[in-house]
């Protein structure tokens, strides 16, 4: 879901989380540790 991905990016931007949500090749989403 695009909105979820955008929100996750915003949250990471403000340092609230150390997780990053990325799109997988099959169109799903995957939560990975931020580097």
UniProtKB/Swiss-Prot annotation:
Disulfide bonds: none annotated. It is an enzyme of class 1 (oxidoreductase). One of its GO terms (biological process) is tricarboxylic acid cycle. GO terms for molecular function: L-malate dehydrogenase (NAD+) activity. Keywords: Mitochondrion, NAD, Oxidoreductase, Tricarboxylic acid cycle. Its EC number is 1.1.1.37. GO terms for cellular component: mitochondrial matrix. Substrate binds at residue 23. It is found in: Mitochondrion matrix. The keyword NAD applies. Homodimer. Belongs to the LDH/MDH superfamily. MDH type 1 family. This is Malate dehydrogenase, mitochondrial. It comes from Capsicum annuum var. annuum.
